[in-house]
Amino acid sequence: MHFLVALVLLGQIIGSTLSSQVRGDLECNDREAKEWADQAVRYINEHKLHEYKQALNVIKNIVVVPWNGDLVAVFLKLNLLETECHVLDPTPVEKCTIRPQQNHAVEMDCDAKIMFDVETFKQDVFVKCHSTPDSVEDVRRNCLKCPILLSPSDPHVVDSVEYVLNKHNEQLSGHVYEVLEISRGQHKYEPEAFYVEFAIVEVNCTAQEAHDDHHHCHPNTAGEDHIAFCKATVFRSHASLEKPKHENFESDCVILDVKEGHAHSHLIEHHIGKYSTSPGQNSTVECVAECPVAFVNKEVPTDISDRHTTPVKGCPGKILHFQL
């Protein structure tokens, strides 16, 4: 199984804390290289529309070249690892747990270009990333019965999410939730089950209206919506062709403290609707009209020139976590 996601980002960051004395002879393990990489990773996490926050794993290459006037161009090749924090989770990425290899880890390779003005500290950032999970063969080689990643749109995954959400809504008098995004699904063994992770939001519907495919529910007004991230296991066979009805399940939902104006508050309207699965697997994601305000709709280069990313002394840097 192969998953591919291309994340194309263009934006602007003002007020950098980096020194105006930009070194041009950086090696991948230098402190300054880590600062540049952190800037790129922070930007990715602030503008990523789906799934999980990313953490720096390896600085593969860094090249700093003079540009026009006071501008300096910093070219980076980065390897990132998926964390267990959803993009809506306000937890700083430094405190997020890296998804372990036995839980079918996912890596992301990114090319980043940062245009830095040494006088004003203004930055323009361009990032392009491809996300790929560990291969099923590698997962099973290291752990024969570890859960295997499924597509978020897999029927068993979607059915499991709907089943758990309906059970929750039945128990919450006066509160109805809908799915914002199905972020992850896995097939588990001994006992056989489906493990799912998904984000939900409270909506202004009655329970009856929520079950009506012709009725469109909307999140509560700003400041009133409750957003939660759920992890659940539904115990059922992969061979089962019917939707779950009376299966045993375990679930845990945590309310996320997403403030109005938070970098990802746009996700509420971006995702709301039935069967909202993440497009991050087997798909390409690019900026369109619905992207956050920080994006600009104009032609941008899609590749970072190889002449700026040729291997340099001291690169690649050390592996901070593990290599897939």
From Swiss-Prot:
Secreted found in the keyword field: yes
Top-rank taxon: Eukaryota
Cellular-component GO terms for this entry: blood microparticle; extracellular matrix
UniProt key word Transcription regulation: no
Domain Cystatin fetuin-A-type: 22-130, 141-254
GO molecular function term, any single one: cysteine-type endopeptidase inhibitor activity
Protein's cellular compartments: Secreted
UniProt motif Cell attachment site: location: 23-25
Residues carrying sugar: N204, N282
Keyword entries, A-Z: Disulfide bond, Glycoprotein, Metalloenzyme inhibitor, Metalloprotease inhibitor, Protease inhibitor, Repeat, Secreted, Signal
Organ and tissue specificity: Expressed by the liver.
Secretion signal span: 1-19
Site description Cleavage, residues in chain: R140, R141
Matches recorded under InterPro entries: Cystatin_dom, Cystatin_Fetuin_A, Cystatin_sf, Kininogen_Fetuin_HRG, Prot_inh_fetuin_CS
Cystine connections: C28-C315, C85-C96, C110-C129, C143-C146, C205-C217, C230-C253, C287-C291
SMART domains xrefs: CY
Subunit structure: Homodimer.
PANTHER family per UniProt: ALPHA-2-HS-GLYCOPROTEIN, FETUIN
Family of this protein: Belongs to the fetuin family.
Protein role: Suppress hemorrhage induced by metalloproteinases from the same venom (brevilysin-H3, -H4, -H6) and from habu venom (metalloproteinases HR1A and HR1B). The non-hemorrhagic brevilysin-L4 is not inhibited by cMSF. Does not inhibit serine and cysteine proteases such as trypsin, chymotrypsin, thermolysin, and papain. The inhibition may occur by formation of a non-covalent complex between this protein and the proteinases at their metalloproteinase domains.
Designated name of the protein: Antihemorrhagic factor cMSF
Native species: Gloydius brevicauda
